[in-house]
Amino acid sequence: MPTLEIAQKKLEFIKKAEEYYNALCTNIQLSGDKLKVISVTSVNPGEGKTTTSVNIARSFARAGYKTLLIDGDTRNSVMSGFFKSREKITGLTEFLSGTADLSHGLCDTNIENLFVVQSGTVSPNPTALLQSKNFNDMIETLRKYFDYIIVDTAPIGIVIDAAIITQKCDASILVTATGEVNKRDVQKAKQQLEQTGKLFLGVVFNKLDISVDKYGVYGFYGNYGKK
């Protein structure tokens, strides 16, 4: 099994926010015993959804849960900036298109209990791949082997991929950069996730001024939408 190493600069940043993401994972667990597969999306690129996905997965893994992080943003992946490999690795698109076995793309990491499936090469029709039977079968198979599966998706405000993926998950999380996104756009994204029929866990307010007490440390489950 190939091994990925988390970039040292990224790891240093992650450690600074470790306490906050541990609390976020606790909130996820308190939301339901059967929430194993969780999608993470945002309205726009650059809001921190990938950072949030990596941190959630790492927190679960460090707590002793066998955790899989899937890079489902097959259009514009940035997760390769977090994990480094010394060898060529196939990914999600290769498996979904039938050109590679999933076992070839399942990677161990230098973090105990954390495994990763990278996005793979860019597909000419990523939506069709995500709608395929292969994707559904993959998620159902992986459920048997992992305690938690975190799926980083493309921004739901840009493409429909996040909604398609969420339909195969148990719940979803929306990440938004505080002060950078119109409230109406965030509410629309929230509605899209709710329309999948899967539990919407809440909004993570990223880039938040932690001095604003009512949002808590990271804004999850805050007062959003009540003003």
UniProtKB/Swiss-Prot annotation:
Principal subcellular localisation of the protein: cytoplasm
GO annotation terms (biological process): capsule polysaccharide biosynthetic process
Catalytic activity: L-tyrosyl-[protein] + ATP = O-phospho-L-tyrosyl-[protein] + ADP + H(+)
NCBIfam families per UniProt: eps_fam (TIGR01007)
Biological function: Involved in the regulation of capsular polysaccharide biosynthesis. Autophosphorylation of CpsD attenuates its activity and reduces the level of encapsulation. May be part of a complex that directs the coordinated polymerization and export to the cell surface of the capsular polysaccharide.
Activity control: Dephosphorylated and activated by CpsB.
Effect upon mutating T74I: In strain: NCTC 11906 and PO-329
An annotated Gene Ontology molecular function: ATP binding
EC annotation from Swiss-Prot or TrEMBL: 2.7.10.2
Post-translational modification: Autophosphorylated.
Family statement: Belongs to the CpsD/CapB family.
Keyword field: ATP-binding, Capsule biogenesis/degradation, Cytoplasm, Exopolysaccharide synthesis, Kinase, Nucleotide-binding, Phosphoprotein, Transferase, Tyrosine-protein kinase
Organism: Streptococcus pneumoniae
Stated consequence of mutating I14V: In strain: NCTC 11906 and PO-329
Enzyme superclass (EC): transferase
Pathway membership: Capsule biogenesis; capsule polysaccharide biosynthesis
Location within or outside the cell: Cytoplasm
Identification of the protein by name: Tyrosine-protein kinase CpsD
Pfam families, per the entry: AAA_31
InterPro entries (UniProt xref): AAA_dom, Bact_polysacc_biosynth/exp, P-loop_NTPase, Wzc-like_C
